[in-house]
Amino acid sequence: MSTNEIKNDYSAKEETAGPGDSNTSEIKTSDVYKVDKNLPSRFNNPDCFRYSHKTTNPLYRTTNQAYGSKKPTVHEMPTSFNGSRHRFSEHLLKSGMYRDNGFNTMLDKSRLSRPNETSVFYDRINFHSLYHTAGKS
């Protein structure tokens, strides 16, 4: 069976099954392709992804919105899954993320205000140091 025949067969099943038919059998990736034994069920069953269709003005509809609004078919689903080890983040799952609860007592250094001047922010004329190049503001 060629790929075109598989696609035509699948699209014919899609057309005959109505949205309200609850007795229709969902086609799985393993029915069409050879899949790995450790493939997660969400990849074997593309109908588990629930898509809602929001009506938008066609004038403002982008190509990403048009492509993303379509449900995935078995032909777009992966047939193998190679999960990574979680050795890097296992200790974070047990103890939680690091959080610094320290109290900052250092003065903030800024070009706009000098450390010994606290009322500079409230003075609209002497606010910026570039206005006064000759001397101290």
Swiss-Prot record:
Instruction: Identify the domain of life.
Output: Eukaryota
- Residues of the region (Disordered) are 1-29, 62-83
The protein's location, in the record's own words, is: Cytoplasm, Cytoskeleton, Cilium axoneme
Keyword Cytoplasm (UniProt): yes
Keywords in alphabetical order, please. Answer: Cell projection, Cytoplasm, Cytoskeleton
Annotated InterPro entries: PIRC1/2
Query: A single GO BP annotation from the record?
Result: embryonic heart tube left/right pattern formation
- Main localization is cytoplasm
Q: Where is the composition biased (Basic and acidic residues)?
A: 1-16
> Which terms in the GO cellular component ontology are assigned?
axonemal microtubule; cytoplasm; nucleus
Function, as annotated: Microtubule inner protein involved in the attachment of outer dynein arms (ODAs) to dynein-decorated doublet microtubules (DMTs) in cilia axoneme, which is required for motile cilia beating. Functions at the initial step of left-right asymmetry specification of the visceral organs.
The record's similarity note reads: Belongs to the PIERCE1 family.
Please identify the protein, giving its name as recorded. Answer: Piercer of microtubule wall 2 protein
